[in-house]
Amino acid sequence: MQRTMLKSKLHRATVTHSELHYEGSCAIDESLLEAANIHEYEQIQIYNVSNGERFTTYAIRAARGSGVISVNGAAAHKANPGDLVIIATYATYNELEMARYAPELVYVDAANAIVDTRQTIPVQAA
């Protein structure tokens, strides 16, 4: 059996740029890509916490340490500078891989600097 699972997440990143007239993608600070195990040109899902938009694009590299999260091309209509977003990737795992499965969860501050990394999400209470 194959299962599609969360592979990685950048939690509550702040959009720094929104470039409509740019080749479509989302530029992400290279240090954030590495911390979250997101590869350049990998498909990403973006969930805009500020306006509820959800969309798919791909990741490209921004300068290391820049804090850049730039939503580009048509997706720029769905995110503005200052918006909070969750950026997620998913992968398919077989039963043997599931025994070792753990997502890469990266938490950032308002400047998109890493403040925490985890491999589990705490139990949520209503």
Swiss-Prot record:
Protein EC: 4.1.1.11
Pyruvic acid (Ser) modified-residue sites: 25
GO molecular function terms noted in the UniProt entry: aspartate 1-decarboxylase activity
Biochemical pathway: Cofactor biosynthesis; (R)-pantothenate biosynthesis; beta-alanine from L-aspartate: step 1/1
Coiled coil: none
Residues forming the catalytic site: 25, 58
GO BP field: alanine biosynthetic process; pantothenate biosynthetic process
Cofactor note: Binds 1 pyruvoyl group covalently per subunit.
Residues that bind substrate: 57, 73-75
Cell compartment(s), UniProt: Cytoplasm
Cofactor (UniProt): pyruvate
Primary location: cytoplasm
Keyword Cytoplasm: yes
Gene Ontology cellular-component annotations: cytosol
Subunit structure: Heterooctamer of four alpha and four beta subunits.
Biological function: Catalyzes the pyruvoyl-dependent decarboxylation of aspartate to produce beta-alanine.
Protein name as catalogued: Aspartate 1-decarboxylase
Gene this chain is encoded by: panD
